[in-house]
C-alpha cells in the first residue's frame, strides 16, 4: 500500500513539473481570441529592430519609465549604437526612457494621457498587442481620425500608418459603419484598403498583402515582451539548467533512494 502511494506521489510530481511551463506560457499570452504571434527572445536581430521602432515611434508619446537605455546592451547593442540611433530625449545612457512629448500636451491633444509601456506586454499579452497594432482604421467620427478593431474608441492615432497603409471603414447608404461578424462571432467594422504603405502591397486582383508589416509589428511586440522583463533572458537560461539538474541528478537519486528505502518491503 505504501509503495503504491509513493508511486502515485511521484507521478503527481512529474505531472505538475511538466505542466508548469505550458501553464505559465498560457498566462503570459493574455486572454481574448487573437492571432498567435511568434515571440522569440533569442532573436537579437528582431529585438534590436523592435527597439529601433519603439524609440522612433512609440517613445514620442509614451514613456517606459522602468527601462534604462543601457539595458539594450543585453540584446547585443553597443553603447555607441544606442546613443547614435536610439536616444533622442537624453544624452545619458543610464537614464530611463522618457517620452519626448509633455504628458499635459498629450492629454490635451489625445484626450487621455498615454500610458507607460514598460509592462504593457505583461498586462495585455503579446497576441493582443500584435492584433492591436494591425487593427487601426480611419474613422472620421473620432477626434484623432482613427479607431481600432481591437479597442473600439481608442484615442491613439495610428503611429505606423505610413508602414501599414490606411484601412477605412465601409459605410452604408445612411453613412453608418457596416458591421460584420468575425470568425469568433464578434461584430467588427467592415474595412477596405484606402492605400498601401511601405510594408504592404496591393496585388493585381486588389487584395492587399501585409506580410512585411506583420513582421515589422512582430519585431516591435517581441521587444515589448523583452522590455516587460529584461531578466527573463537570464531566467530562461537558469531555468533550463535547473530542469537539467532535476532530471539528470535528482531524479536518479530519488529513484535509487526509493529502492533503498523499500527494498525490504514485500
PLM features: residue spans?
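Extracytoplasmic/secreted proteins, especially bacterial periplasmic and envelope-associated proteins
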Residues: 45, 49, 53, 116, ...
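Electrostatic cytochrome c docking/interface patches
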Residues: 29-52, 63-74, 82, 228-236
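Structural motif marking the loop-to-transmembrane transition
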Residues: 3-10, 236-244
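Electron-transfer interface patches adjacent to heme c in soluble/periplasmic c-type cytochromes
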Residues: 77-186, 191-213
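Short, aromatic-rich amphipathic segments at membrane interfaces
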Residues: 202-241
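Post-cleavage N-terminal segment of exported redox proteins
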Residues: 2-41, 226-231, 249-266
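Sec-exported extracytoplasmic/periplasmic mature domains
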Residues: 55, 59-66, 122, 134-138, ...
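Sequence/structural segment immediately N-terminal to covalent heme-attachment motifs in c-type
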Residues: 42-64, 220, 237-245, 249-253
Amino acid at each position: 500500500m505504501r509503495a503504491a502511494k509513493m508511486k502515485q506521489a511521484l507521478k503527481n510530481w512529474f505531472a505538475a513539473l511538466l505542466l508548469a511551463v505550458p501553464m505559465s506560457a498560457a498566462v503570459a499570452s493574455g486572454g481574448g481570441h487573437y492571432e498567435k504571434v511568434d515571440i522569440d527572445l533569442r532573436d537579437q536581430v528582431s529585438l534590436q529592430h523592435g527597439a529601433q521602432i519603439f524609440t522612433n515611434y512609440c517613445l514620442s508619446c509614451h514613456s517606459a519609465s522602468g527601462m534604462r537605455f543601457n539595458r539594450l546592451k543585453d540584446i547585443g547593442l553597443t553603447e555607441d549604437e544606442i546613443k547614435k540611433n536610439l536616444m533622442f530625449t537624453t544624452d545619458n545612457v543610464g537614464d530611463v526612457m522618457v517620452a519626448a512629448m509633455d504628458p499635459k500636451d498629450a492629454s490635451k491633444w489625445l484626450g487621455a494621457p498615454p500610458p507607460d509601456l514598460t509592462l504593457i506586454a505583461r498586462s495585455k499579452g503579446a497576441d493582443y498587442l500584435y492584433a492591436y497594432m494591425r487593427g487601426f482604421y480611419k474613422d472620421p467620427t473620432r477626434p484623432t481620425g482613427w479607431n481600432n478593431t481591437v479597442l473600439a474608441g481608442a484615442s491613439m492615432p495610428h503611429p505606423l500608418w505610413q508602414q501599414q497603409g490606411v484601412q477605412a471603414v465601409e459605410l452604408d447608404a445612411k453613412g453608418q459603419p457596416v458591421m460584420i461578424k468575425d470568425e469568433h462571432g464578434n461584430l467588427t467594422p467592415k474595412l477596405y484598403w484606402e492605400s498601401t504603405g511601405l510594408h504592404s502591397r496591393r496585388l493585381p486582383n486588389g487584395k492587399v498583402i501585409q506580410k512585411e508589416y506583420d513582421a515589422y509589428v512582430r519585431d516591435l511586440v517581441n521587444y515589448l515582451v523583452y522590455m516587460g522583463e529584461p531578466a527573463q533572458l537570464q531566467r530562461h537560461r537558469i531555468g533550463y539548467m535547473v530542469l537539467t539538474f532535476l532530471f539528470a541528478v535528482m531524479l536518479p537519486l530519488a529513484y535509487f533512494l526509493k529502492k533503498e528505502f523499500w527494498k525490504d518491503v514485500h
